[in-house]
Design a protein with these regions (language model features):
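Canonical Rossmann dinucleotide-binding motif of NAD(H)/NADP(H)-dependent dehydrogenases/reductases
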Residues: 2-33
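The beta1-alpha1 cofactor-binding region of Rossmann-like NAD(H)/NADP(H)-dependent oxidoreductases
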Residues: 39-40, 58-69, 104
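Conserved mid-core segment of classical short-chain dehydrogenase/reductases
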Residues: 89-108, 127, 131-137, 157-160, ...
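Catalytic Tyr-X3-Lys loop
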Residues: 100-120, 144, 168
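Active-site helix of classical SDR
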Residues: 122, 164, 172
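Alpha-helical segment proximal to the catalytic Tyr-Lys
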Residues: 127, 176-178
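Residue(s) in the substrate-gating loop at a strand-loop-helix junction
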Residues: 148
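C-terminal substrate-recognition "lid" of short-chain dehydrogenase/reductases
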Residues: 222-246, 251
Length: 255
């Protein structure tokens, strides 16, 4: 599938990895719906990018909100060919801490946004993609999810986050198999330490120390590098049902 003239929804598209992906896809001729809870940032980015970008204020875990983002893509641009799930939240809380056991409400919220929200967008996007005409290779769409290296080597205090991202890893292959009959591919990227709004808000010395943890290149990953992998996945039809670590060979320590 080519990016040019294809229609994409990017969740979490107003900042970080999502915004980097939106910028690259628009630059290569894609038509984008930026789906995010941050209205100000999303509207600003859409205005900056012009006619080939729209913003939808979106709570990915809410069916009506998620469906509205998908419907905007179809009504504004005539269909849907790609979904990139970047929306997510981070939480740090130990299973048993000084104040007692991990709050169940906070665990559920991380799962709801990161895992349930991703699946919610996948199922609704797949429905829209399946209605489209296939290309010459029989392909109707591609879905790219965002997991994390925490799915494989989660640190102390990351039980909820690692569980949510591990769920994304675990559902990648079965969903790819489910959607193969519809000509829809499903892939997952598991990023390491990247330049996100949260990390860029840390002191420079902390950012530098985190970057040095990466074997090579010894720095934080850049949103444009994540976006470049998304583009390659879109354009390479044999990539399906797999998880790619994008992490500079880092393996996280326990804490």
């Amino acid at each position: 599938m080519q990016v040019r003239d294809s229609v994409f929804v990017v969740t979490g598209g107003a900042s970080g990895l999502g915004a980097g992906t939106v910028r690259l896809l628009v630059a290569n001729g894609g038509k984008l719906v930026i789906a995010d809870v941050n209205k100000a940032a999303g509207e600003s980015l859409a205005a900056e990018l012009g006619a080939n970008a729209r913003f939808a204020e979106t709570n990915v875990a809410d069916e009506a909100s998620a469906r509205a983002a998908i419907e905007l893509a179809v009504s504004a641009f005539g269909g849907l060919h790609g979904l990139v799930n970047c929306a997510g939240i981070v939480a740090g809380e130990k299973t048993l801490g000084k104040e007692g056991p991990h709050a169940l409400a906070s665990f559920k919220r991380v799962i709801d946004v990161n895992l349930v929200g991703s699946f919610n967008m996948i199922r609704l996007a797949a429905e829209a993609m399946a209605k489209g005409e296939p290309n010459a290779g029989g392909e109707r769409g591609v879905i790219v999810n965002t997991a994390s290296v925490a799915a494989f080597d989660g640190q102390m205090g990351q039980a909820a986050y690692a569980a949510s991202k591990g769920g994304i890893v675990g559902m990648t292959l079965p969903i790819a198999r489910d959607l193969s009959r519809n000509g829809i591919r499903v892939m997952t990227i598991a990023p390491g330490i990247f330049e996100t709004p949260m990390l860029l808000g840390m002191p420079p010395e902390v950012q530098e120390a985190l970057g040095k943890m990466v074997p090579f290149p010894s720095r934080l990953g850049k949103p444009a590098e994540y976006a470049a992998l998304v583009q390659h996945i879109v354009e390479n039809p044999m990539l399906n049902g797999e998880v790619i670590r994008l992490d500079g060979a880092i393996r996280m320590q326990p804490k």
